Every structure is written in C-alpha cells, then in structure tokens.
Amino acid sequence: MLFTFFDPIEYAAKTVNKNAPTIPMTDIFRNYKDYFKRALAGYRLRTYYIKGSPRPEELANAIYGNPQLYWVLLMCNDNYDPYYGWITSQEAAYQASIQKYKNVGGDQIVYHVNENGEKFYNLISYDDNPYVWYDKGDKARKYPQYEGALAAVDTYEAAVLENEKLRQIKIIAKSDINSFMNDLIRIMEKSYGNDK
C-alpha cells in the first residue's frame, strides 16, 4: 500500500549498463519515514510482546487483521531488515549465528558478562589469577580491565539473547490503525507532487 501510493518513477540502471533503458520503478527514494512520523505524532505507540516467532506479515494479520500492514510494524520499530532485524525461531537464530561466525569457528566467546549484566568484550583471564581480566592484546598483563567473576557468552547464546530482545516491539493500537492510515494518506496526498 505504502509504495503504491505514488506514481512509479522512470529509472535507468546506468551503473550496470551506461546504455540501460529507462523503466518504471516503485518510488523507493521518497522519505516515507517522514510521512509516517508526521502521521504518528497524533498517536501513542504501545508496547507489544511477540509470542513465538511470527513473521511481520503474520503478526500484522494477527493484530490488525491485514497482513499488508506489516510495514507499519517495521516502521514503528525503525526496522528496515525484516529478515535479520525481526525475531526468529531459536533454531533460525542458531543457524544465523553459525553463518555469521563460520569463518572464525562456531564455538567462540563473543563477550563476558558480570552479575549486573554488563558486557565486556575481548577479555581473557589466566589460570594463576582467574578473577583478574585483561584485554587479549595485553600479553604482559599490565592493565587489568576487570576484577571479579565473569560469565562467558558464546556465539549461540549471544544469538539467542539478541533474538529475544526483538520480542518487545512498539505498535499502533488496533483501535487506532484506521484513523492512523487515514491521517497518513491525507499527509501523503497533501505532499503529492510537492516534494519531488
């Protein structure tokens, strides 16, 4: 709906072929986020906790009764990557982690955490004093970075933890979606032809 509101633009892929023909293309170069923010100014986003790992289209259908409103969920959360930026199943998170770290080995420590949940990257301790942590590059052990117990977080656990953060999102309330869409269309109609 959003990308079909404006007329297509003429586009020639000159970087691929300097003699490329001009073809009509969806106008993806507009600042749709600006229209969205202007329409959103009159609404309060709600916090929503995703159960399971539905795709944006499935969740839009569950919340609004319309899978085509998936882009509302993405834009409310400044998410422009519905594959890596959206919650996945735990298995998919593992597989993405394997792919991400395939060139460095899958069983790597990504970071350590203390009892307060603070993250510490690139640290190592030694057997003679396991509660003193140094940067991996500090081979002479001159500059301790942390003293105390730290728990290692490997690539798989880090992937699951990052994935779980995506469970909490912002949404426009179901009761507001129709008036929001009307406001958004009105804003786009006013700017039609004025912001090219």
From Swiss-Prot:
Induction: Expressed in the late phase of the viral replicative cycle. It comes from the Viruses. Signal peptide: none annotated. Keywords: Late protein, Viral baseplate protein, Viral release from host cell, Viral tail assembly, Viral tail protein, Virion. Coiled coil: none annotated. The keyword DNA-binding does not apply. InterPro entries: Phage_T4_Gp53_baseplate_wedge (IPR022607). The keyword Oxidoreductase does not apply. One of its GO terms (biological process) is viral tail assembly. GO terms for cellular component: virus tail, baseplate. It is found in: Virion. Part of the baseplate macromolecular complex which consists of gp5, gp5.4, gp27 (central spike complex); gp6, gp25, gp53 (inner baseplate); gp7, gp8 (intermediate baseplate); gp9, gp10, gp11, gp12 (peripheral); gp48 and gp54 (proximal region of the tail tube). Interacts with gp25 and with the (gp6)2-gp7 heterotrimeric molecule. Baseplate protein that is located next to the tail tube (inner baseplate). Involved in the tail assembly. Involved in the tail assembly. This is Baseplate wedge protein gp53. It comes from Enterobacteria phage T4 (Bacteriophage T4). The gene is 53.
